């Protein structure tokens, strides 16, 4: 808990992996963690970003994130990647498209597979946002799978919803 609040990126990533885990024994640990961090959530601005492939979602996020950091803010990016319906894998390549932002000390970029979950997000995106809020990130940017048609859930869990075209 203290490691998350202090902004330790390695521990933040481990906490996210815990809530993303499908193992039964991890569910109890994840629920306990979420209960502990709950009082430290709700202070971030959550921005959902969607659009057709090639619309510039990653470019927008990198530019916005770097500007926010230059103004003394901390930025977390939750990049949801599509999962293959055949092998359940995903590309998880958004970090490579946001190279400059990824180098920033006050940035945290976490790619996550959608795992076939509809709504443009992963089934644990809300819990992942809570972890990033508890870690003190001022902005949490959620990059959806990016079709623009089914990203309705992200609009329900964010403060601002952007559609880029």
What is each residue range found by the language model?
Residues 2-45, 55, 64-150, 155-164:
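Nucleotide-state-sensitive switch-loop elements of NTP-binding domains
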Residues 47-49:
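Hydrophobic anchor at the beta1->P-loop junction of P-loop NTPases
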Residues 58:
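Walker A/P-loop
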């Amino acid at each position: 808990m203290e490691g998350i609040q202090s902004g330790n990126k390695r521990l933040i990533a481990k906490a996210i992996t815990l809530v993303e885990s499908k193992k039964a024994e991890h569910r109890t640990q994840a629920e306990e963690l979420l209960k502990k961090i709950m009082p430290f959530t709700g202070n971030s601005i959550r921005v959902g970003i969607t659009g057709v492939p090639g619309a510039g979602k990653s470019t927008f996020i990198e530019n916005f994130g770097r500007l926010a950091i230059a103004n003394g803010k901390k930025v977390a990016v939750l990049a949801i990647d599509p999962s293959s319906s055949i092998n359940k894998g995903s590309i998880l390549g958004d970090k490579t498209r946001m190279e400059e932002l990824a180098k920033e000390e006050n940035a945290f970029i976490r790619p996550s597979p959608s795992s076939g979950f509809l709504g443009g997000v992963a089934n644990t995106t809300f819990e992942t946002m809570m972890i990033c809020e508890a870690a003190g990130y001022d902005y949490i940017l959620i990059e959806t799978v990016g079709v623009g048609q089914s990203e309705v859930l992200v609009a329900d869990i964010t403060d601002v919803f952007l559609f880029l075209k």
